[in-house]
Amino acid sequence: MMESLETHADIFGKEASKAIADAAQRFSLSYYEEALRLLSDAEAGGGRLHITGIGKPHHVANYMASLFSSTGTPCYFLDGTEATHGSAGQVKKGDVVMAISYFGNVAELVATVKTLKRNGARIISVTGFPESEIARMGDVHLDVHVEREGDYLNKPPRISMLVSLFMLMNLSVILQARKGIDQEEYLKWHPSGQLGKREKP
């Protein structure tokens, strides 16, 4: 803890960079094969994608619901703490739910996943521990394990959330490309802001 602030920043930068470099090698197309098949089968049967998490993964889930939706894969955020109090009703039989929990044993999310499975949803679990309860309940498990969080406490979820986001962003690129989303389609969903600007004919 006696190191300089510059040293702390340098350590985080190096550990985060290494984690992303490792993730880029791990998260090849074959890594996503089962998840892609599950999503494709669900979509063919009229199923929809939902995403949930509690704590920091809640924010990852909220962002990814927006990103998936804006790039050709409609996705609905599901509050992990509200699901067992009625919000699970947004998920119908045949839908797919991504459940994000790094350690994979958060009691509220475990209860949510159990409820969703009982109601006929398929689960893609995103955790850092394949032996965790949420990982084992998943029809598909996407492993986002990291060695360290990048600081001297090694507790606040920094690198684990960074790698989770990287993995899910990569999946969004694959889904976007598989569906052949072009500029015109993207602009239909994102007409405002700087991204929505286009040259007038």
Residue spans of the language-model regions?
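Glycine-rich phosphate-binding loops that contact phosphosugars or nucleotide phosphates
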Residues: 40, 48-179
